[in-house]
Amino acid sequence: QVKTDTLAFQAYSQRMQVFMQQLENDPFTAFQDSVNMALYQAHPIKKRLTVADVQQLDYAKALQIYQQRFANAADFSFAVVGNVDLDAIEPLLEQYVATLPAQQDREKLTHPILTISGKKTVHFTTDMVQPKTTVYICNYKTGAVSSKQTLVYKLLDAVLDMVYTESVREEQGGTYGVSTNISVNQLPIPAVYMAIHFQTDSTKVATLLPIIYDELGKIATKGPKAEHLQKAKEYAKKTYIDQQINNGYWLDRLVDTQFYGYDIQASYLSDLEKITAKDIQKAAKTLLNSPNLKEVVQVGVSNK
């Protein structure tokens, strides 16, 4: 039985409307909207909520959707990790999990949210009290990615962090830091994504943008510096060892085996040692040559 609380819902709605109104007045909101449009066009699920959207929320419909999602638990997967007594938890699972309704039907994802293919470049200006420029670069490549390749992309991510710290932050003094994130997704389709984000002074973006691409191009052409790769491996090994005591780490490994069919844990350290500069070079080339580049640049201009 779903517990209802109309007053709590109304209070939540009011808080959300105030928050959404504040977002409307934030210059960064225009940047986020532009990134979403570049990546997903006008996909309704990726559309930013507005005050009008919150005002139209239907509490009864929300409860109905909630009940529908738990009406058939046949294809649910449950994972329990941590310091638990298996004998003590078994009756709880029998009481709260095993009693969930289940039928023979299985659901399939029919409307996946996919990043649009092709190149997209969006540059625009926004009035600001304190002008700054924000840059977001994304590229992705579809295709199956093995557990070892996942580790290769993890090392490339770390190498790029070091490269951009040296070239963009220290040599150019153009930003506090460049954020890079390379992630491997298995669902809804296998793909690897690279996202690069930084903020800088509006007068420096023309200098810094080419450096971002040039540094990735150098790795794709010549491979990473030996010291960068070594540091990336050392950090990956240390992180791997440190994470062994974290529940979240083991939960991720269960997800890997349950949904993706591979066990990165079994060969992590041996795979790590086998990765060469050529592997990193190939990964960089894959991302650099992918035709799905998205570049969004918001240039702040003074409204004084």
Language model feature labels by segment:
Residues 94-98, 155, 213:
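Short, solvent-exposed amphipathic alpha-helical segments in soluble enzyme
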Residues 166:
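Long, His/Glu/Asp-enriched segments that create or flank divalent metal/ion-associated functional microenvironments
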